[in-house]
Amino acid sequence: MANVRARIELMVGQKSNIPAEMLSFEGLETDKEHVAVVFNQADKHQSTPLVRMHSECLTGDVFHSSRCDCGEQLEETINRMSESGGIILYLRQEGRGIGLYNKLDAYELQSQGMNTYEANNHLGFGDDLRDFKEAAQMLEALNISKIKLVTNNPKKIKDIQNYGIEIDEVVNTHAHVKQGNEHYLHSKAAHGHKLNFDK
């Protein structure tokens, strides 16, 4: 059974001006160091908190790569949760589970014309290797069984429900279109992601 091992206060966001708490865990399925970032003590004060399961993306989250919209989705969620409260489950699942170096190899294939899924397949991987059991374990450690899920990804909805978490509402993020990620976003939409390109 997973438990919270530590709870640390810190300031987050692009300007480091948003108060939050970062939680670490013990007893998860693997030894990956997933964390929860909690805003406005949502785990203590909200019966159905806003939750985003955000898979680590070094290139997008840290270096603001033009290849994806991960950093923009993360920042949008931080800003939303700074006002309404919520929990980001930051999961160490780089490259939809294939790892950083393999993702960089996939980037090279994308530069040659493949889309993000074709590149992963060419390297011998499935479209999405992520499993969200540990996300469910983290929520259970916080005594949370019902959430409002921030996602555009139907796989996340299905997977977290399969692990016993009830979804009260699905909240979409914006389609953060910029030079360099249009093909990537349209590939995701073709694979079922709910993206509104009109906004």
UniProtKB/Swiss-Prot annotation:
Q: Where does Zn(2+) bind?
A: 57, 68, 70
Which parts form a coiled-coil structure per UniProt?
Answer: none
* Disulfide bond sites: none
Q: Which reaction does it catalyse?
A: GTP + 4 H2O = 2,5-diamino-6-hydroxy-4-(5-phosphoribosylamino)-pyrimidine + formate + 2 phosphate + 3 H(+)
Q: Where is the catalytic site?
A: 128, 130
Q: Which GO terms describe its molecular function?
A: GTP binding; GTP cyclohydrolase II activity; zinc ion binding
Protein family membership: Belongs to the GTP cyclohydrolase II family.
Q: Could you identify this protein by its name?
A: GTP cyclohydrolase-2
